[in-house]
Amino acid sequence: MSVPIPHVQGRGMTAADQLARWAGRTPDAWALRFDGGGRTYAELDERVTRLARALADRGVGTGDRVAVLGLNSMEVWETYLAGVRLGAIVVPVNFRLVADEVAYVLTDSGATALVVDAALGEVATKAREQAPGVTTVLTIGGDLEEAVAAASAEALEIEVDEDEPAFIMYTSGTTGRPKGAVLTHRNLLVHVFSQVTHLGWAPDDRVGVPGAPLFHIAGLAGGLPPLLLGGTHVILRSGGFDPVATLDLVERERVSNIFLVPAMWAAVVAVPGIADRDLSSLRRISWGAAPASTTLLRTMIDTFPQAEVITAFGQTECSPVTCLLRGEDSIRKIGSVGTPMLNVEVRVVDDAMRDVPQGDVGEIVYRSPMVMREYWGKPEATAEAFAGGWFHSGDLVRQDEDGYLYVVDRKKDMIITGGENVYCAEVEDVLAAHPGVAEVALIGVPDARYGEAPLAVVAPRDPASPPTPEELGAWCRERLARYKHPREYSIVQALPRNPSGKVLKTALRAEHRAGSLVSDPAV
């Protein structure tokens, strides 16, 4: 029996357009899987239309901002897609933020509607006291279901311009307030099509991204490809990361692609009995968002021999992936973040925007249809980011003779000691390879002789038997030039992190009375 294709309200360049097409072509195929349940494409498309109409009935229109404060769930995805279908701008909110921080996102974005998880109701209520512009609230696990059930399922007749904003993704600021990166419909779809073409995804790819909450760009970008290809996005419930539960999910749902940050992969490969599990469904295993040691990458390759190990590099402002390392290159060029993805131009430049010689360190700048339109309401920051017609990443890299890129550090996270530049990532990578080190952060502290001196803050693998400063010093002496050696070592139980999991070097500098005023990576 033929199934009528639902009305497509955009120009083919929105996520909601693609959802409607798949609802017509494969209505009974799973679009979402979550906690043992799911939504077919027909069910998801109808619920998205109903929710879009429910928001419209409450005064939300094209260009209005709809904030979403929710734990991972199918309803969060439905709200994202409903906002897109309506032509509104979706504002994902980090569910780990306190009320004051949530209020800032609501007021800075100018949100008029808020869809909030019932579990986060107290935070939302306090935040709304500081955000009077929010006049519409729907609660996941509460009146949202009533609103969806009461709304019409008739297709919306709204044309959405693909060059208009789809999402405002707030970077997780570690100094000062976060900035909202404005991503258009075109930004996101070009990213999806570039990624799936580059990696060879297929409609039967089932993807789990437990390492990336849905408020994070990696959660959004990780879920869009299967939905736009007619595949299935498998969602893991929010909460503390459980490597055993993650492997259970892969086996149960036959996940083919999965993304985790390095610390999570380290926990996964250490699960007892992992070799006895049926993980044959995995086709691609990816990491990103933080540096991974070469030791961990080799372990991943050995643990999942049937899967392609992929290094994904980028940032929120770029939708987010700009460079990929895959296949045999994961071994041949281990330590690299790869080469530019399809539809991404890169240069490696100095402060005067001159291309640096091959092998020299410079800032990587981008030009791409995937790069954000602007920082929301911040024209000066936008102009600075796009100086010279290229987007300035703030990442310092070098490029080898084959065009492969290697991240050296963040541009503003560098220690200058005795006139020599010490790139923190290089020293951290060496120390992270020590068998007694779980994680490490390098910071600069004031030094009467050299101006700044490197200090390594180390979290040991075994707190009961941490490595000594003498052992760590000997390790570095064998692997680093002398000026790069940490002058001091501080042993701690764990490194402080922001809500997105990035190490808070500002907190470490404050604790150790460091003199550096640099900012932490925002994404």
What kind of region is each of these model predictions?
Residues G70, V91-Y104, A118-V123, G231-R252, ...:
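ATP-dependent adenylate-forming carboxylate-activation enzymes
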Residues R11, A20, D28-S73, W77, ...:
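Conserved AMP-binding/adenylate-forming core of the ANL superfamily
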Residues T40-A42, A166-F193:
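Conserved AMP-binding A3 loop
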Residues G12, P27-D28, S152-Y170, R177, ...:
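Conserved pre-ATP/AMP-binding loop-to-beta segment of ANL
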